[in-house]
Amino acid sequence: MLKITISFVLSLLVSVASFAQVDRSQFPKAGPAPVIKIGEAETFTLANGLKVFVVENDKLPRVSFTLVFERDPLFEGDKAGLTGFVGQMMKAGTTNRTKDQIDEEVDFIGANLGVSSTSMSASSLKKHQGKILDLMADVLYNPIFPEEELEKLKKQSLTGLATSKDDPNSISRRLSSAMVYGKDHPYGESTTAESIGNVTVEDVKSYYNTFFKPNIAYLAIVGDMSKSEAEQVVKKYFGEWKPGDVPKFTYDTPDPLAKTVVGLVDRSSSVQTVIDIAQPIDLTVGDEDYISSRVLNQIFGGGSSSRLFTNLREDKGYTYGAYSSFSADKLIGEFSASASVRTEVTDSAVYEFIYEINRLVEDGVTQEELDKAKANLAGSFGRSLESPAAIASFALNIERYDLPKDYYETYLQKMNALTVADINRTADDLIDPSKLYITAVGNGAEIKDKLAQFGEVLMFDNMGYPAKEMEAVDADMTSEKVIDNYIAAIGGMDKAQAIKGAKLEMAAEVMGTKLTIELIHDDANMRFAQKTLVGGNVMQTSVIKDGKGTASVQGQSMPMSDEQVDAAKLSTYFLPELHYESMGYTLTLDGIKDVEGTPAYKVIVATPLGSSVNNYYSVETGLKVKNENPVSGDTFYSDYQEKNGVLIPMTQTIKSAMIPVPLEAKITKLEINPELTEADFN
């Protein structure tokens, strides 16, 4: 019913990015590495254990404060999602100020104040430093953690989770993390609706009372402030902060693979596959391989001139972009390479990824590639020095990772000294091409068998858990029987065939914008009309009659192509299952699948011109629970109610990667077998 409206909604939400053409035929030759004057951090430590780093820079009358808590990674378990609430809860009000007062006072002086579960940051003009520090200290010492704020945050988190469960990129990240680290590791666990629901205000308070301690904290001050002034300021605002015991945590290192494996999440409606190839690596900031890994990544998948980009996009045309990363971490790092590719080239793209990984390890890099990468990274490093946050991170990293005091001042010299042999050694140290985690999120029916050439294919759900084993389809079950069971479940053939047409109104809301959708089905004459109103104004209409279709958006009318009309016919009838045979559709039963916990028969419905959708019918009830459409996304049917002796789904929920939140449309008016005139379809 809603396919054309959804396409209209998507057109309102999707923006098109333009990319400038860059001449890469000439690349500047790398010169000698410049001497970087960052400014040496002066340090002192308060009696409570707070370590302070001061990087004075009086060129601008600004000062920034960055407070970082050095706790071990935290496995949240059945409270997963807790840490995401801590910072916002702390800013939601103190014993002295409401949330609005905090925001207003920060805005009034043109300052910034941020809080997370592991950090606080504040910045302002020099003349306002007392005010911003007073606000920072108030939030640090006196949060009240209002219950109503947590409930609001939990609702927002649940909405975001619902969206991410149908976003291929989010699914891919969850799956890759789960496979690389395991679900019992802090880097592999996932936030669920249940874990969000488990979080209480007492949990947030407990976290705050446990981890917000000065003896595990570093404070970096960057800007117009001397060490002597910093000592006075820090003692004033942080000197009375009480230290405390903070728990330590250790985790097992992920077990190495014996051989490459493939993880697959089946999204039948996907026309693309999100591919990620990953591996845990032993890499920490300051390691011998750290700087060379930055250069290695720039060559392999760090930008538009990298090997992955050149191969998969410019040469093969499989994707808009292919990238890689080497993430450093005290606990365990990760190598990753990823791209989104067309379904039909999924296996070819994976082959090229593996080819490039093998080529990198076995053949190494060239001097020309090394020179270009150094030049690119030197420019990026130089630009980063303009950010106070970057300067603060340099000072903190020197302490946290026990780096030489001049580590960042000599960063470019160290990078410039790297040779081809150094980069090749790093590739060999960090990557094992025979033990990769390959993950794919896409149309399983199209890609599963093709991926088996790379390793055992393991099936997962959209939260990164092993997919439930569905029972086998009975030998005598067919797609026709599934449809017969559906018709019987909604009320029987006689009552269903008695419906010759319908008028209905549906109400929906997208990001605060209310939509009204009016639909008219004339099954007897194969006519259909749809109108979408936003704020009472007609924004989109579509009409199908006499075998032709017309769509109009904001008054601009355009005829539908034969292919568009062919696809739209699937939604022309009020009860399309009654007409599959007469319309010449081909039905294929594709097993039993899990639809959000409900075992359901999957039926592929293909039109004579080749377009198709997937319908899912509950094994238990026979009712249709889901439709997958390559254009509009996934539609879930619920709240079945009897109308004229036939069960009708009164709620349809659309989930699409192109809609920021699920679109829930409810039938508010329904008229069965109304009198219809030609005017209804003009």
Predicted regions and their residues:
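An aromatic/glycine/proline-enriched structural segment found at the starts
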Residues: 22-29, 218-283, 442, 448-472
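M16/MPP (pitrilysin/insulinase) zinc-metallopeptidase core fold and M16-derived inactive scaffolds
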Residues: 64-126, 166, 186-190, 302-318
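Flexible, processing/modification-adjacent segments and terminal tails
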Residues: 195, 474-481, 488, 546-612, ...
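N-terminal mature ectodomain segment of secretory-pathway/periplasmic proteins
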Residues: 481-556, 585-589, 594
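Gly/Pro-enriched, hydrophobic low-complexity segments
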Residues: 535, 598-681
